[in-house]
Amino acid sequence: MSKIIGIDLGTTNSCVAVMEGGEPKVIPNPEGNRTTPSVVAFKNEERQVGEVAKRQAITNPNTIMSVKRHMGTDYKVEIEGKEYTPQEISAIILQNLKASAEAYLGETVTKAVITVPAYFNDAERQATKDAGRIAGLEVERIINEPTAAALAYGLEKQDEEQKILVYDLGGGTFDVSILELADGTFEVISTAGDNRLGGDDFDQVIIDHLVAEFKKENNIDLSQDKMALQRLKDAAEKAKKDLSGVTQTQISLPFISAGAAXPLHLELTLTRAKFEELSANLVERTLEPTRRALKDAGLSASELDRVILVGGSTRIPAVQEAIKRETGKEPYKGVNPDEVVALGAAVQGGVLTGDVEGVLLLDVTPLSLGIETMGGVFTKLIERNTTIPTSKSQVFSTAADNQPAVDIHVLQGERPMSADNKTLGRFQLTDIPPAPRGIPQIEVTFDIDANGIVNVRAKDLGTSKEQAITIQSSSGLSDEEVDRMVKEAEANADADQKRKEEVELRNEADQLVFQTDKVVKDLEGKVDAAEVAKATEAKEALQAAIEKNELEEIRAKKDALQEIVQQLTVKLYEQAQAAAGQAEGAQGAQDAGAKKDNVVDAEFEEVKEDK
């Protein structure tokens, strides 16, 4: 069976891993890095992904960052006259990770397990699946990020019964989950979080501080200067990382702006204490969901066996200290927080292919599901934190006499009134026979599969007439749209490859022009002038084709010139050999004459053995 890769599709960084020899391994990208920034940029009709896109994020307006925040919405971004959905942008990142995996494994990859925040609703999960399909991947399973972390951690802990808190503070989202591990079974008991909180926010408080300090000193607002803002963002991220290891760091940005008299420089010492003061509110915001998850699980902090940290932002000392204070447990640091989710996804891939045995993953639905009933009330059929896959049915009736149809309004959320929750979809069950209010029996069934995707059906028990819906919210893509996007993604991949080949062809042609000039110069006066003229003419024809940018013409003229240059090079080589032979003969004769006139004998002493 072909390998199933595990992908952590993150808000700020993504990571891909695979099972090798029974162990999950992170696959490095072409630059040799183990994580890839989730950034896509468009420049001169070329797509850039990762570090190269991130480096010019602020200066290039056609750069898309943190697109994961928009998954499951109808958000679109227009780039160079074309509209892109969050699924398409995510697919570009997934294509990049897929290509890294294929280069590493030396085989085509078509299947993946992709992780999502535990708090992702149905629309967001469906959008993630669609992104995988557009990228040419069969998404075998969508799993929650904290669950994936527990899977990676739990490989060597399958025989221990434990209650684990997974504290996942990534670049753009925060999740906390409580899991139970026993006999190779991972069960998520509860989950909570904030999908608008992450490492980006910690960077931003440093940027705001730098902007405020510079404005105080120079009365210039750097936040209005895109070039300066890019440098501030890079410096803030570096300072944040530095302060995880040292107690103070120097931020030095020369020529950050122009003053009336001369250029202005930003020089500032940032201490860990100041950073903790600036970010105290952000750290505090992670604790409320932590308390809520514990409460939902019916546990006190003292009942936890282990606290696992996930996400690069958990390296911040204040974050580690806060979770230690809150739980009374020293956070476990035996897993790389940047990679553990991808490793867990790879383990789940191994479970699905049969490479990993004895592991059962029981995930939960993060939000309650139900329908709108009389008076706009939200009636829950499946409570949040219910283990999935699951199915639940409930019988309802009509609200008016002789009601011919019922509208089924499917919702997700925790508020008591329908208007305050998120609509997942609507459908209608018609042709209900006339009957007094309350008599018809309408059975509504909710099914949630292992990916957290919802199917709802309504059945009139009197007539057995049935109507069903697979939830496709406003952001969901139809099969036709996904197919179109898959074709576009493939076409773009082909276009990117073609563009690369074009660049290589032009480079080869330029190199040949340079080589021809050199050969012609070396052969001047040594070969027939007609041959030199022929080479010069072919070279000029190639230069003209390069200027016109006619690729087929470049290829033809390049091949023609290549042949002429090869013939000339052979002649040059033959002449060099002949010249070397003559020189050798002359040198030999000279050496022989010199031998007679000036013979130098080595001194030696003959030693005779005594007989």
Curated annotation (Swiss-Prot):
Residues 579-592 have a biased composition (Low complexity). Keywords: ATP-binding, Chaperone, Nucleotide-binding, Phosphoprotein, Stress response. GO terms for molecular function: ATP binding; ATP-dependent protein folding chaperone; unfolded protein binding. It holds the Pfam family HSP70. InterPro entries: ATPase_NBD, Chaperone_DnaK, Heat_shock_70_CS, HSP70_C_sf, HSP70_peptide-bd_sf, Hsp_70_fam. Induction: By stress conditions e.g. heat shock. CDD domains: ASKHA_NBD_HSP70_DnaK-like. The modification Phosphothreonine is found at residue 173. Residues 579-598 are annotated as: Disordered. NCBIfam families: PRK00290.1, prok_dnaK. Acts as a chaperone. Belongs to the heat shock protein 70 family. This is Chaperone protein DnaK. It comes from Bacillus cereus (strain ATCC 10987 / NRS 248).
